[in-house]
Amino acid sequence: MVIKISRKYLVIAGSILLLLSCKKPKDPCSKRGFEYSSSIFHCWYGPSTDSVPLGSIMMLEGSVPRAFTDEYTNSKVTNTSSILNGPLGVGMILPNYQAAIDSFEITAEVGKVIKDTINLSAGQLKGVRTIEWDCSSIDSFKMRLKIKPLAKGIYSFALKQQSSVDKDCALYKYFLQPGNTNQHLNYWMDAFGSVSSSVAFYTYCFKVY
């Protein structure tokens, strides 16, 4: 009788082990395809004047929270990613409309400035650098750039969509508008006659004399 009971328990135990071994592993990308966005945050350019001397130092800085309210679902989300990055576009408006990253020396005091030769073409790199934010804070991402003009002209800067993929593969997108009282878009208007909604949202203009 003891032997029969033991065999019965062995069969049950074996069945349990088999079920456990066949259990589907947890999907590490349970939120693949999910996107969360916010466009209420700002970046700041300094000094806020519409013109700066050649060789002077300008600053671009920003801070965005890990936790925010998604503007589409109105739900509270938290970004636990260890990377947040995105493009900074630099263009000359006058005297010639062209990509103009080489007209500035851009270095990071907080975060990183990356010449991304893997994901960007040689043509794109003439006007774009990838900004990688500092992610060491438990509640926010931060960046601060030092910008030194190397050539005279009228320029536009645009910090475009900054994004990251969380550990569960959800995509978090931050859209930052310059928080300065005046973005000096009159320079753009004078050159092109109109300002699109995208330019009005992202762009900050100034003159280097």
Across the structure, where does each feature detected by a protein language model lie?
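Bacterial N-terminal signal peptides that target proteins for export
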Residues: 2-11
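Glycine-rich, aromatic-bearing surface loops/beta-hairpins
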Residues: 145, 155-209
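Sequence contexts marking disulfide-bonded cysteines in secreted/extracellular proteins
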Residues: 23, 28-30, 134-136, 168-170, ...
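Acidic/polar, low-complexity intrinsically disordered N-terminal segments immediately downstream
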Residues: 25-97, 188, 209
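Extracellular Ig-like/FN3 beta-sandwich strand-entry sites
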Residues: 55-57, 150-156
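C-terminal motif of bacterial Sec signal peptides marking the signal peptidase cleavage site
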Residues: 19-21
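Structured domain cores in non-transmembrane regions
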Residues: 68-147
